[in-house]
């Protein structure tokens, strides 16, 4: 561990799943050796550095009210550097959820001006930031998210033969994830072409159950304890999100040797590469077309293996990139 350096992770919601998963990455031995990591809830009071080399890493989602927190960290925090990870905002989020966009972008410009580096969690997110001049290009660093997937990397890979395409999807039942679009697409797909199982829970559960009513080739399942069993019979994993900063579901699917059928949006663009099947975001008809393409593809097994090979190295790349960033003087 580097002597006399604290790395303070600043949050305002300790229950956010994506953020808590990101924090686990800093337990990796190489990152743990970069300093003493501490997690602090900014709602409990002002946050101050205790040494000249301390670094603050901001995980909370910026808005107009929270600019005061960033201003206090900048002017009075005493940190050598402040790094903000953009877990939330993307081009897809802006297109789906934001009006007026001009005011939203101005808020982000002010927030990013108050920190030393902005970490985008995908290359596509970084490109969106640069395109709209939210911060200088040399201030924005892309460090794509990942997780340890040893359990999934050792699963038997996709072995599609004949019969209906076995599609799996999982995640929070929320508008963001686009499962309503996926079920509507399945209503246009015959049962002898594809079947779908969706696992999860969330505020849109009743809506999804209603959409799936009468569709014998669509099953809504409770959350699972282990993805291995849920994915064991999968030919591919669908990720029809309206927005997705990165999308760890894609990492897990690819590590399991399953290609993804995903919206061409935000961080999912980074994961489609040559192994996935892309569709237009928010488009039921485009999802239908992607299902037909994947069901008729003769190389799904090869696509799965290619996707796994890439996923296998992404975690180590992420750790290396974070070590390089934290090592900067």
Predicted regions and their residues:
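Conserved acidic donor-binding segment of nucleotide-sugar-dependent glycosyltransferases
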Residues: 274-285, 292-298
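A short, active-site helix/loop in glycosyltransferases that binds the activated sugar's phosphate group
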Residues: 113-139
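Aromatic "clamp/platform" in nucleotide-sugar-dependent glycosyltransferases that forms part
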Residues: 242
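Nucleotide-activated donor-binding/catalytic signature segment of Leloir-type glycosyltransferases, i.e.
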Residues: 209-224
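Short hydrophobic beta-strand element within catalytic cores of glycosyltransferases
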Residues: 259-262
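A charged, aromatic-enriched C-terminal amphipathic alpha-helix characteristic of glycosyltransferases
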Residues: 18, 296-329
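Membrane-proximal helix-turn-helix segments that form the acceptor-binding/catalytic region
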Residues: 100-118
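Conserved donor-binding/catalytic core segment of Leloir-type glycosyltransferases
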Residues: 159-177, 183-186
């Amino acid at each position: 561990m580097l002597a006399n350096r604290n790395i303070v992770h600043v949050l305002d919601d300790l229950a956010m799943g994506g953020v808590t998963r990101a924090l686990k990455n800093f337990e990796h031995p190489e990152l743990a050796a970069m300093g003493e990591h501490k997690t602090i809830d900014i709602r409990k009071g002002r946050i101050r550095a205790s040494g000249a080399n301390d670094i603050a890493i901001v995980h909370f989602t910026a808005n107009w009210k929270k600019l005061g927190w960033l201003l206090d960290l900048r002017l009075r925090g005493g940190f050598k550097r402040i790094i903000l990870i953009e877990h939330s905002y993307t081009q897809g989020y802006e297109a789906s959820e934001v009006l007026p966009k001009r005011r939203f972008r101005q808020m982000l410009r002010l927030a990013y001006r108050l920190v030393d580096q902005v970490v985008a969690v995908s290359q596509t997110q970084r490109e969106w930031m640069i395109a709209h001049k939210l911060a200088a290009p040399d201030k924005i660093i892309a460090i794509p998210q990942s997780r340890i997937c040893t359990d999934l990397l050792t699963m038997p890979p996709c072995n599609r033969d004949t019969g209906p395409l076995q599609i799996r999807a999982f995640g929070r039942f929320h508008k963001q994830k686009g499962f309503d679009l996926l079920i509507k697409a399945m209503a246009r797909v015959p049962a002898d072409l594809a079947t779908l199982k969706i696992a999860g829970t969330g505020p849109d559960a009743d809506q999804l159950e209603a959409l799936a009513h009468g569709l014998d080739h669509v099953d809504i399942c409770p959350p699972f304890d282990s993805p291995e069993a849920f994915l064991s019979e999968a030919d591919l994993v669908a990720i029809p999100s309206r927005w997705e900063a990165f999308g760890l579901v894609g990492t897990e699917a690819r590590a399991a040797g399953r290609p993804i059928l995903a919206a061409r949006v935000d961080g999912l663009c980074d994961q489609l590469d040559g192994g996935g099947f892309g569709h237009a975001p928010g488009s039921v008809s485009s999802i239908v077309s992607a299902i037909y393409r994947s069901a008729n593809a003769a190389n799904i097994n090869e696509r799965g293996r290619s996707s796994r090979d890439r996923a296998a190295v992404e975690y180590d790349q992420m750790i290396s990139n974070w070590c390089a960033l934290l090592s900067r003087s």
